[in-house]
Amino acid sequence: MKIHEYQGKEILRKFGVAVPRGKPAFSVDEAVKVAEELGGPVWVVKAQIHAGGRGKGGGVKVAKSIEQVREYANQILGMQLVTHQTGPEGQKVNRLMVEEGADIKQELYVSLVVDRVTQKIVLMGSSEGGMDIEEVAEKHPELIHKVIVEPSTGLLDAQADDLAAKIGVPAASIPQARAILQGLYKAFWETDASLAEINPLNVSSDGKVIALDAKFNFDSNALFRHPEIVAYRDLDEEDPAEIEASKFDLAYISLDGNIGCLVNGAGLAMATMDTIKLFGGEPANFLDVGGGATTEKVTEAFKLMLKNPDLKAILVNIFGGIMRCDVIAEGVIAGSKAVNLNVPLVVRMKGTNEDLGKKMLADSGLPIISADSMEEAAQKVVAAAAGK
């Protein structure tokens, strides 16, 4: 789960991380009121969407008068902001953040992520803040420094000081940087975050260290422990289909293709999409029904996929381990009838009660295209989507 920058800064503030004074605004008049409360002479008007690259897309403006705050708020609020993370369709801006301007001298980058190889938390930092870290990693990997943090000890003073020095924090400002890094780590740890990022971390001309941005992602599996984080959820920033899927415990992600995929298991789902692309097709979605798929879940999965106007065919690819193939077959048959399925349906099933499941499909009277291998299934669904 993602949250907005102003919400991320609220979290940082709770953990002692220095951030600029600022507030969210949901209208132009509210933005002006916030600016007047903060006082001048400089304000930053920022679009609040769940995507990076807002500055390059025109979603961040520096205002030097109240009139400019009004002008920029009017420009940004309601705009369809396109960044490298939104896709070409962009994201509508429904809220702003207005905060006091900062004396920017040195922009740095710091973040915390989970390293699945070492199964520990990694603190990353770079002297190249204020830009896309992916670009830095590609062109100048030597400028990214990493610290492995032992969960049993947390981020040690020496580790924080060492990273701060490596990314260019002046010696006199290292104690401030240490406090920020340790506060960021505590926020990451105590909220069950999967990402906590400050980009940029600013060092002003008088040596003050302050977080000018805040980005958090949270582990959805841990949200039951954090109702205060769930309260930050902004459904306007999420795909309606994905919101609907979550009600039925379906892992669903919309994609740009025209071939629907219904699979059990995330790994098999990704392999299925790769195989479809290998044979020239484009998946319309990632959909993992999990190991406990019921007739209701399969029916809802079909309904979700059929809401996509570009859908041309569906591939059901099931490995029956915990989930029996006859149960999936029952769900496919009931789901197809319930939604009056009107696109070609290719089904491939392997595993527990495979023969029974295949017989149920064959006896259903539905025009289901069967396949024995993943390659055959992908070829058939690509052909069906193309009308062949």
Curated annotation (Swiss-Prot):
Cofactor: binding comment: Binds 1 Mg(2+) ion per subunit.
Q: Which InterPro entries match?
A: ATP-grasp, ATP-grasp_succ-CoA_synth-type, ATP_grasp_subdomain_1, Succ-CoA_synthase_bsu_CS, SUCC_ACL_C, Succ_CoA_ligase-like_bsu, Succinyl-CoA_synth-like
Under the heading SUPFAM superfamilies, the entry gives: Glutathione synthetase ATP-binding domain-like, Succinyl-CoA synthetase domains
Pathway field: Carbohydrate metabolism; tricarboxylic acid cycle; succinate from succinyl-CoA (ligase route): step 1/1
Instruction: Name the residues that bind ATP.
Output: 46, 53-55, 99, 102, 107
Cite the binding residues for Mg(2+). Answer: 199, 213
**First-tier enzyme category under EC:** ligase
Ligand binding (substrate): 264, 321-323
Q: Which GO terms describe its cellular component?
A: cytosol; succinate-CoA ligase complex
Reactions catalysed according to its record: succinate + ATP + CoA = succinyl-CoA + ADP + phosphate; GTP + succinate + CoA = succinyl-CoA + GDP + phosphate
So which residues are the signal peptide here? none
Per its UniProt record, the required cofactor names are: Mg(2+)
Provide the alphabetized UniProt keywords.
ATP-binding, Ligase, Magnesium, Metal-binding, Nucleotide-binding, Tricarboxylic acid cycle
| One Gene Ontology molecular-function label | succinate-CoA ligase (GDP-forming) activity
Kinase in keyword set: no
Q: Which Gene3D superfamilies match?
A: ATP-grasp fold, A domain, ATP-grasp fold, B domain, Succinyl-CoA synthetase domains
Q: Name one GO biological process term.
A: succinyl-CoA metabolic process
Domain ATP-grasp residue range list: 9-244
Record has Metal-binding as a keyword: yes
Assembly description? Heterotetramer of two alpha and two beta subunits.
Q: What does this protein do?
A: Succinyl-CoA synthetase functions in the citric acid cycle (TCA), coupling the hydrolysis of succinyl-CoA to the synthesis of either ATP or GTP and thus represents the only step of substrate-level phosphorylation in the TCA. The beta subunit provides nucleotide specificity of the enzyme and binds the substrate succinate, while the binding sites for coenzyme A and phosphate are found in the alpha subunit.
Q: Which PANTHER family match?
A: SUCCINATE--COA LIGASE [GDP-FORMING] SUBUNIT BETA, MITOCHONDRIAL, SUCCINYL-COA SYNTHETASE BETA CHAIN
Q: Which family does this protein fall into?
A: Belongs to the succinate/malate CoA ligase beta subunit family.
The name of this protein is Succinate--CoA ligase [ADP-forming] subunit beta
Q: What is the lineage of its organism?
A: Bacteria, Pseudomonadati, Pseudomonadota, Betaproteobacteria, Burkholderiales
| Gene responsible for this protein | sucC
